[in-house]
Each structure stands twice: as structure tokens, then as C-alpha cells.
Amino acid sequence: MTKFLAGAAIVLAVAFGSFFSQSSTVTPPAPRYLPNDWDSTCTISKSGAYEVYSGDNSFSTSSADHLSALKIHPNINSTNWEQWEFDGSSQTGLSSVLLVFSRDPSYSFFGQGNLRIEFYIALPDGKRVEVLDYLEESTVVHCPGRYTAGMWNSTDRSYSFRIDDNMKNAQLSFDSAKIHGKFNVTSDTSSALADGTLWTGKDDRKGVSELSPGLFYAVPIPGGFVQMDATLESGKRLVFKGKGGSTRLWAKAGWLNLCGGWKNIRGWAGPYTVVYWELISRINKGVKYTTGLLFRDGELLVGTRNGNISQTEDYTVFEDLYGGEVKGSFADQSTGHNLKFVSPDQEKEWSFDIEHMHSFVEFRAPGEDEYGNKGLGQSGFTNRVSGGEVGEDRAYEGRGITEKCRWPKEFGKLALAIASGAGFFGPKFQMIFIKVVSYLV
């Protein structure tokens, strides 16, 4: 079975071709290639598609370490992984982008290697672009005081990012047959840790980087202005301005071992920026872990990992909403959410309604979770966000994105064989198959 699936995955690999050339409206311009100005002060990690480090490697748990820098060095081993994530949506909410750079050995089972790019785009006409790509090599460079830069590349395609060390600007560039262009994020908020406190880089406080057992989380750019300028395979050009941010995740085990599902939100409404993660642990079975950030005009109002009502500590309250127009195809039929931030010390409460507008990614995950639930999978939406401080004279409106999923506990061999066979029917089925399985081990 293993040999069959690995062979099938190789046959299903997506072939990429020529590049597009198009002048860009994004400023400042993103670098097409990695900077060549590194020196002896820089940390450099280069990895081939199938490389894993033999033995124990350096795995960062310190809250003092730079959020964008390498968390695993000199390279991932057979169990741990890390990723850099960037996202944004347009002012209208009709367009969005989610781009994830991963070093992750959990899908090497399929012969595709360890270097994954996930690229999901919502288009104004309601269509979407879903790219799952595996690259031949990646290089990540961190030069203290200057930048972190990364490139995932093969002979005929590449994806790169560069983040200033003050984490105020991220520049992304991508060249492939599917999409060619640039995406920039300019922060108007301060970087934060999993416990909701702001990152200073000066002290190591135990446990504040860990979102749930085994999973570490940080928010280099909670919110900021984004610019997208890209040309699609069809020749269509996608240009928009809006808001978005970036997230860092690194972990000691694969997703299915760590959690049964999650929901995450990034959005804005008027002067407010909201970021929220909710995760159901499988290490501590069924325990819910949360983290939330609320900014106004770039200043942190509430930062907390407390998801329970309290008379003394700041907390969040998250609730799914139903009855709207846009929902996923799976058991989770929610059409949005309500997210509250409460601060007993400030004697204030803020409430935001988050309504799904448009789907940017969706796929089904066959199987059951540990509670016998079926209809599992992952969905992503652009959102309409409205709200503000409870008791204020006005409510603000903005946009954002949601990603939500529920994972099966395991996939039987028959289900995997069916999914593998489905890949022969086209790139969309192939993408669904490999994407789902990439989280299994």
C-alpha cells in the first residue's frame, strides 16, 4: 500500500511551465530572489526536498527568540515542522489570498518531499485558485537586525518572502505557471505571542509561545495593509489593496496527532483589528485552547489566552452563527461567528459579528473523529466584519478571513486508496488528496 500510494503521488505531481512578465503596482518591490548580502552574523538553513536532520535538532521554545527567524535548526527532523503564513483580503471582501511556506516531513510518505507551498486565492467573480506545490529546495536566512528571507524553489518556479527584522514589512514574490506576482504586508500593529502579550525579544517567559501541547504560535504581523498584484494562468490580473497579516507556527508532531480541529480569524472593522485562534487538543484530549488579540488604532486593548468567563482576567467568547447565505459543504454549517473580547479591569466589552462572504478553499476529509462525527474537512472564507465597543454610539464595518476545520482521528487504508485514485481525475482532486494526507502523520 505504501509503495502504491507513493507511486501514485509521484504520477500526480503537478507540472509547471513558463513564467509571466507583468509590471507591478506593489510598493516597495519584493525581491525576486533571496538577498545575497548575508554574512557571518546570519543564520542560514538550506534544505533539499527529501532532507531531514538525523537526531535531535534545535527546537525553539523561547519567547525571546525572533518570531520570524528559524525555529528549527539546522533543519527539520522526522517529527517536527515549521511554517510561515501570510494572508490578506481586499477592502470589498471579494478577493483574498492565503500563502503558506512549510518545511514538513509528514507527507514524505507520498514521494513529494518535505517542502510545501499552499496558495489559496478568492477571485472577485466567485471563482478561486487553489495551488498545492512541492518544491525541490528551500533556503531560509535570518540576519539579526536586518531581515528573515526564505525561498522555496524548483528549476521552473519559485516562491519567496522577506520580512524586515522589525516585522513592519513583509514582501512576497511568486513565479509559477499558475500565478506570477507580488504580495506585500505593511504592519500597523505590534507583534504578539501565544499568550496574548506583545513580543519584546528581551525576556524568555516559560510557556508563552505554546498555543497547545506541542504546537507553538506567534503573530509577527497581527494586522496591516496589504497589496496584491498578480497574473493568473488564465491571463487575468488580480490587483487589490486591503488588510491582512502574518502568522508563525512550529510543532513537535503532525496535525492529526496534535489536534482534532481549529478555527482562526483575522479581521478588521474601522479602527479595530482582531486575531483569534481556537484549537481542540488531542494531546490533552478534547481540551480547547484559545488565543485572542484586539487592537484599536494599532494599540493592544486585549491580549489573552483565556477562553472562559472571568471576573478578574481578560477573556474571549467565541460563538458560531447560523442562517446566513454562505456556508461550507460539511457538517459544520455555520455561516459566521460572533467574537467578544471582555476586560473586567477596563470594565469594557467589544463584540464583532463575522459573516462569511466568499469561499477561498474547501476540501473534504474522509473518516470519523474520536467522537464518531463525520462530514469533516477544511473550509476558508472571506468575511464581512462589523462591531466595536459595546455601548458605543456606532458600529464599524470591515473585512477579514476565517479558516476552520475538523480532522478525522485516522484514515483507513481503503479511504486513502480511494483518495489516491481520485487524483487521476484531475489536479483539483489531486490537490485535495495530497493536502489532506499532508496533515496525517
Swiss-Prot record:
InterPro entries: DA_C (IPR054499). Keywords: Glycoprotein, Isomerase, Signal, Virulence. Coiled coil: none annotated. One of its GO terms (molecular function) is isomerase activity. Its EC number is 5.5.1.-. Pathway: Mycotoxin biosynthesis. The keyword Signal applies. Residues 1-25 form the signal peptide. Belongs to the Diels-Alderase family. This is Hexane cyclase gkaB. It comes from Penicillium citrinum. The gene is gkaB.
